[in-house]
Regions:
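Polybasic, glycine- and aromatic-enriched phosphate-binding surface used to engage nucleic acids
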Residues: 1-127, 131, 137, 144-145
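In a subset of proteins, long, contiguous C-terminal domains/tails are tracked
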Residues: 129-167
Length: 167
């Protein structure tokens, strides 16, 4: 069955396209692994990271995340802070129209708390973000993560929470 599928691709000349022509064999997709989560390359208002609860994989159209020794839910929940938002503005590339793009090395440099404690539960973050309440998540995580766990005062992070509006 697989052989017939490959032969059909060759009849349709899929193997002559650029992506397939540089592979050996042409039908083998490189670097396929199941990540813990995904980070979107192009962002508008905030660097979105999502948990890979379905066990899916992807090509290079979206960044794949691997959490090492830490629950991915904690990593992702802790990225929903003004610190990460400001970091994305500094690390990313702006292509105009409000779109910011993060290449792999830029995404790896995004700042987030070193101690992954106390952020809102990811299920709650997900519900609020889907309801269009990203600001509520950022405000609550600012209180929990930046103030309570990192020890910053409100004055310390108030310039950070305004950075996306300033840039």
């Amino acid at each position: 069955k697989l052989r017939r599928y490959i032969e059909e691709g060759e009849r349709k000349e899929f193997h002559t396209g650029y992506k397939c022509s540089i592979r050996e064999p042409w039908y083998l997709v490189p670097s396929v692994w199941v990540p813990d989560g995904f980070a979107f390359r192009q962002i508008y208002d905030f660097p979105r990271m999502v948990l890979n609860a379905s066990g899916a994989t992807s090509t290079d159209t979206i960044h794949r995340l691997r959490s090492k020794g830490v629950k991915p839910e904690r990593v992702i929940a802790n990225t929903y802070t003004w610190l990460t938002a400001a970091s994305a503005e500094i690390e990313g590339r702006s292509y105009g129209g409000g779109v910011l793009e993060l290449e792999p090395t830029e995404a790896e440099r995004l700042m987030m708390p070193a101690k992954l404690n106390g952020a809102m539960p990811l299920t709650e973050v997900d519900q609020l973000v889907r309801a269009g309440r990203l600001d509520s998540v950022l405000e609550e995580n600012a209180r929990i993560v930046l103030r309570d766990h990192m020890g910053l005062s409100a004055a310390d992070f108030s310039p950070i929470d305004q950075t996306p509006d300033l840039l």
